[in-house]
């Protein structure tokens, strides 16, 4: 679970004008969000997490708390907006019950905190996992059919936030369902892909045309801030590019611009799965060689950002420039 504070939390508090609070601020997206909030000026943002941040953002009031139990947590002054990013999300990586304990109970506790503090706006990061695996294109209006504990827990968490919204006409809720989010500090799918290409080789497990919805982290934040400015009390949107990029297109964008010497091969899925089982211990080295992660590469996440597209807030052809931005900010290391 992401959520945070340095060992010696700041004692600063928001002023009477009110400021934002970020649950899960020590995580990947949370760290980028906090930088954005600090850069925008205004009241000092509060970050709440169980873990210390890997990268401390100057100007943030870091607090330590567990979103599964916020009954004794208090923030002095008015809170303008809650960003609920706290979650157990890595799959594989956790027993099933941990997804529910953190994601569902966390939603219950965060909305209860919002009631106590009379907060009228929440931004909640859900997941495209609520749609379940499918080769069909999914939009915000598609039926939900999660199959994983993570996806089911996020679906339940969405309903908890909706119940909070429905209690008062003065409240606002933005729910974003992010696809694969990449960028500095990600440490996930795209980082592993970059490591493999840097090592000189990427293997396609049985197919190259898997559609993988994705979004650069700063573009995700742009979309969230855009949604916050909408006049609607409730906004639900998919956080991804509209291009329906295939795995091969993503790999080639990496390879052409940053790893021109890397070679790619396509090997039957069964062979790759057998190799992943044998090399599974190497996942501890950060390469993520795990059978379940291999299967993710052959299952499409074909997601359309319909809400953003209908409002002309979704731009095509950005994967190359997004990778360039990541390379520039990480000195080409893609970390």
Locate predicted features.
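Amphipathic terminal alpha-helices
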Residues: 1-9, 303-335
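Flexible, glycine-rich beta-alpha linker
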Residues: 131-132, 174-192
């Amino acid at each position: 679970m992401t959520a945070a504070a340095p060992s010696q939390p700041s004692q600063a508090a928001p002023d009477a004008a009110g400021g934002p609070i970020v649950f899960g601020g020590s995580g990947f997206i949370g760290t980028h969000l906090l930088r954005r909030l600090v850069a925008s000026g205004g009241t000092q943002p509060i970050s709440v997490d169980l873990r210390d941040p890997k990268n401390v953002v100057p100007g943030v009031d870091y607090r330590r708390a567990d979103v599964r139990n916020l009954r004794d947590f208090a923030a002095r002054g008015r809170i303008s907006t809650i960003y609920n990013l706290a979650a157990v999300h890595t799959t594989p990586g956790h027993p099933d019950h941990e997804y529910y304990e953190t994601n569902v109970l966390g939603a219950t506790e965060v909305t209860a905190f919002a009631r106590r503090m009379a907060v009228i706006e929440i931004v909640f990061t859900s997941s495209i996992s609520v749609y379940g695996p499918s080769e069909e294109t999914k939009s915000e209006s598609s039926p939900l059919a999660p199959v994983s504990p993570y996806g089911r827990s996020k679906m339940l968490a969405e309903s908890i936030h909706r119940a909070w919204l429905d209690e008062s006409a003065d409240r606002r809720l933005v729910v974003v369902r992010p696809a694969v989010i990449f960028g500095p500090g990600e440490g996930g799918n795209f980082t592993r892909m970059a490591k493999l290409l840097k090592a000189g080789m990427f293997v396609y497990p049985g197919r190259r045309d898997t559609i993988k919805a994705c979004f650069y982290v700063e573009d995700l934040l742009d979309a969230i801030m855009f949604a916050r400015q909408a006049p609607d009390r409730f906004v639900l949107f998919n956080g991804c590019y509209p291009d329906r990029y295939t795995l091969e297109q993503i790999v080639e964008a990496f390879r052409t611009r940053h790893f021109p010497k890397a070679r790619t091969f396509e090997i039957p899925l069964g062979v790759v799965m057998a190799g992943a089982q044998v090399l599974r211990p190497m996942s501890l080295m950060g390469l993520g060689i795990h059978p379940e992660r291999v299967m993710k590469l052959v299952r499409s996440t074909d997601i359309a950002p319909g809400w953003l597209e209908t409002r002309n807030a979704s731009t095509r052809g950005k994967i190359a420039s997004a990778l360039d931005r990541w390379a520039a900010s990480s000195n080409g290391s893609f970390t």
